[in-house]
């Protein structure tokens, strides 16, 4: 094993938290149980890493083995990346082809390697008939950079692929071509949907967010105590408050459902509109360029935050459709223009 590969193993193992080390190594399944028992996991991490690299060398580890370990680490820490969603479509009249995962992998890899001399492509099968693809990009003159790979998660026989955001935007057309041809689709477009939470993106595009998340029973009637009402308050006011709070909860439930929402961190709205005024000679009356403004809502869990606004009395119910349509439209980037 040369020094470059040994260093790649060392840096990959070094970033694994000690609390996850054994779990990830066993998932990798490259070292035997007996070999792992020879490692003292109570010593300094640098020493542990060195012992593990020696075991990799003893087992004649390859670059593909290192790539598999990196994929597993990324699967455990998928939320550290920002994921984009791509949607593919077939040409009108195209028949539905039988899908073969091995054929998909072979075709995908060949397309990239024919177009680009220096590229490393590795695959790892995952749950729900999905495959994780790790791509280390190089150029015609530089070897692949193993420390800044791109990731693609593709679910077989679906038109959706999820990709980690990459700085190498110039490679996106090639990646799109490889996905489209290998999956036997006709064209591919990037959706206006992005998040760190891959499972939530999947739930949105596959319309699973009302099934795959745990549901909660919200049918219990509201009691005066749960509404925070003062028992000494006028009974008519109590009744009015109770009716309004029940209405707010009913409307919120109709819009968002009983289930926890998919996790998104932001929604962005770009407004572009022509200036309109009944006053002649206004400052902006002759302006040809439209007025532009950008509004961004952000929260660790945006949809749950939006769901709680009306019940908390912060906003009126129902909320604007621009805020509540995010899961159904499958987008959290919006462009609003004049009709």
From Swiss-Prot:
Cysteine disulfide partners in this protein: none
The name this protein goes by in its record: Centromere protein N
Oligomeric form and interacting partners: Component of the CENPA-NAC complex, at least composed of CENPA, CENPC, CENPH, CENPM, CENPN, CENPT and CENPU. The CENPA-NAC complex interacts with the CENPA-CAD complex, composed of CENPI, CENPK, CENPL, CENPO, CENPP, CENPQ, CENPR and CENPS. Interacts directly with CENPA. Identified in a centromere complex containing histones H2A, H2B and H4, and at least CENPA, CENPB, CENPC, CENPT, CENPN, HJURP, SUPT16H, SSRP1 and RSF1.
Gene Ontology BP annotations: CENP-A containing chromatin assembly; chromosome segregation
Family: Belongs to the CENP-N/CHL4 family.
UniProt cross-references to InterPro entries, sorted A to Z: CENP-NAC/CAD_complex, Chl4/mis15/CENP-N
A GO cellular component annotation in the UniProt record: nucleoplasm
Subcellular localization: Nucleus; Chromosome, Centromere; Chromosome, Centromere, Kinetochore
Entry function: Component of the CENPA-NAC (nucleosome-associated) complex, a complex that plays a central role in assembly of kinetochore proteins, mitotic progression and chromosome segregation. The CENPA-NAC complex recruits the CENPA-CAD (nucleosome distal) complex and may be involved in incorporation of newly synthesized CENPA into centromeres. CENPN is the first protein to bind specifically to CENPA nucleosomes and the direct binding of CENPA nucleosomes by CENPN is required for centromere assembly. Required for chromosome congression and efficiently align the chromosomes on a metaphase plate.
Primary subcellular site in the record, as a coarse category: nucleus
Entry keyword annotation includes Nucleus: yes
One Pfam family it belongs to: CENP-N
Gene: CENPN
UniProtKB keywords: Centromere, Chromosome, Kinetochore, Nucleus, Phosphoprotein
The organism's place on the tree of life at top rank: Eukaryota
In-chain residues carrying the UniProt-annotated modification Phosphoserine: 226, 235
């Amino acid at each position: 094993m040369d020094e470059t590969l040994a260093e790649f193993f060392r840096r990959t193992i070094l970033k694994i938290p000690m609390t996850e080390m054994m779990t990830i190594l066993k998932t990798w399944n490259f070292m035997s149980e007996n070999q792992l028992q020879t490692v003292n996991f109570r010593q300094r991490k640098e020493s542990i890493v060195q012992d593990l690299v020696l075991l990799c060398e003893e087992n004649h580890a390859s670059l593909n083995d290192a790539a598999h370990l990196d994929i597993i680490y990324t699967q455990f820490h998928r939320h550290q990346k920002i994921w984009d969603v791509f949607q593919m479509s077939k040409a009108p009249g195209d028949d539905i082809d039988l899908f073969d995962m091995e054929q998909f992998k072979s075709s995908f890899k060949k397309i990239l390697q024919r177009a680009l001399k220096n590229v490393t492509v590795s695959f790892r099968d995952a749950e729900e008939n999905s495959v994780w693809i790790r791509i280390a990009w190089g150029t015609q003159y530089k070897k692949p950079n193993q420390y800044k790979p791109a990731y693609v998660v593709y679910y077989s026989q679906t038109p959706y692929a999820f990709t980690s955001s990459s700085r190498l935007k110039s490679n996106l057309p090639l990646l799109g071509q490889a996905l489209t041809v290998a999956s036997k689709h006709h064209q591919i477009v990037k959706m206006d949907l992005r998040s760190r939470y891959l499972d939530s993106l999947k739930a949105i595009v596959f319309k699973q967010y009302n099934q795959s998340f745990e549901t909660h029973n919200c049918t219990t009637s509201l009691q005066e105590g749960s509404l925070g009402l003062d028992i000494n308050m006028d009974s008519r006011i109590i009744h009015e408050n109770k009716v309004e709070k029940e209405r707010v909860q009913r409307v919120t439930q109709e819009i968002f459902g009983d289930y926890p929402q998919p996790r998104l961190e932001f929604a962005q709205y770009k407004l572009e509109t022509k200036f309109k005024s009944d006053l002649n000679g206004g400052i902006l009356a002759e302006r040809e360029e439209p007025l532009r403004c950008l509004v961004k809502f952000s929260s660790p869990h945006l949809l749950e935050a939006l769901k709680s606004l009306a019940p908390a009395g912060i906003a009126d119910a129902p909320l604007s459709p621009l805020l509540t349509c995010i899961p159904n439209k499958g987008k959290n980037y919006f462009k609003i223009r004049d009709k």
